[in-house]
Regions:
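Residue-level detector of anion-binding/catalytic polar loops
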Residues: 95, 143, 180, 211, ...
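Periplasmic-binding protein-like
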Residues: 119-125, 183-186, 217, 239-249, ...
């Protein structure tokens, strides 16, 4: 039976995208991790999978910017985005360099390492960024695409999720199922994506002749454990609950659902929940979570395509590319 990338990843506790980068002799992975993978292949009798000498390709650089780490973390969402970037980069004949930048330390100092290896273009994972955070990167004077965030007054190409469309579709589904008392499980960590989803929720509610009462707005930490603990504290105050909740992402939905179940509520009989992103935890939830699907790999692939267009000077204008979403109906929403 052939050895698969995910098998090696599981054995070593690394992501499949890391193994893929190493097997394809791509840069951006530490030598220690690279050697661990080579050692495991040799141990299992698959030394033939160890790549030969590196081919000299031009470089693209992916910068994963963590301002606080409250949202950007080692989740399926971001691993899929990175996999899309890697796939399209290789397909286009480039190497991929990967750097992590911490917003907690002086960014200018962290950018010095960029001068140690040349790159033709930069993809900036800007999920946790504000417009001010972009300034040091603009001084690099290289083609750049901002991924997963858009800043209206910054002249920069961007590839983003159509968050308002997705949130509006979620609310529309709830209203079509008869819900009029709809609550919102909103992240207590600010990022542009969540703010746009909030705008979509409010717009869709108004379009249906409904409002979002302050008492139905629950502020939760955007992780499974964080949302669970936040929801437990809120439920201990015995609030009046809506008949349905929209959550900023699947992690919040799953954590909140766990707290609701422990408090004696049955989903969806007592309360319906709908998430956003369509991560594996959504399908694994009991009952499986209705959610909004985001084409994660496509986000990454489009960012690479747009960056290469810049490098090749195919277009001069700045472009915002919005990637559409769609509803995935499972079993966490019922008609009332």
């Amino acid at each position: 039976m052939a050895l698969k990338v995910k098998d090696i990843a599981n054995m070593l506790g690394v992501s499949p995208s890391t193994v893929s980068l190493v097997l394809n002799n791509r840069p951006g992975i530490s030598e220690s991790t690279r050697q661990r993978i080579f050692d495991k292949l040799t141990e299992l009798g698959y030394s033939n999978m160890i790549p030969k000498a590196t081919t000299n390709y031009p470089n693209l650089r992916l910068v994963i910017y963590k301002k606080h780490g409250g949202v950007v973390s080692d989740t399926h969402f971001f691993s899929q985005v990175i996999e899309g970037i890697d796939t399209q980069t290789r397909k286009s004949g480039y190497n991929l360099l990967i750097n992590y930048i911490s917003g907690l330390d002086p960014v200018e100092e962290q950018l010095r390492c960029f001068n140690q290896s040349s790159c033709d273009g930069l993809i900036l994972l800007a999920t946790e960024m504000s417009p001010e955070d972009l300034t040091p990167f603009q001084t690099l004077k290289i083609p750049t695409v901002v991924l997963d965030s858009y800043f209206q007054f910054v002249q920069q190409d961007a590839v983003v999720i159509n968050n308002m469309q997705g949130a509006s579709e979620a609310i529309r589904h709830l209203t079509e199922m008869g819900h009029t008392r709809i609550g919102y499980l909103h992240s207590n960590v600010y990022i542009n994506n969540f703010q746009e989803r909030r705008d979509g929720v409010i717009q869709a509610l108004r379009g249906a002749g409904l409002q979002l009462p302050e008492s139905f707005l629950f502020s939760l930490t955007p992780s499974i454990d964080g949302a669970y603990n936040s929801m437990r504290r809120l439920l201990s105050q015995q609030p009046v609950l809506p008949t349905a909740f929209f959550a900023d992402n699947d992690l919040i939905a799953v954590g909140a659902a766990r707290a609701l179940r422990e408090a004696g509520y049955v989903i969806p009989n007592d309360i319906s929940i709908i998430g956003f992103d369509d991560m594996p935890v959504a399908e694994a939830m009991n009952p499986p979570l209705t959610t909004i699907y985001v084409p994660k790999q496509r986000l990454g692939m489009l960012a690479v395509k747009r960056l290469i267009s810049q490098i090749q000077q195919e277009t001069a204008e700045f472009v915002k590319i919005e990637v559409g979403t769609h509803l995935v109906c499972r079993q966490s929403v019922r008609a009332v």
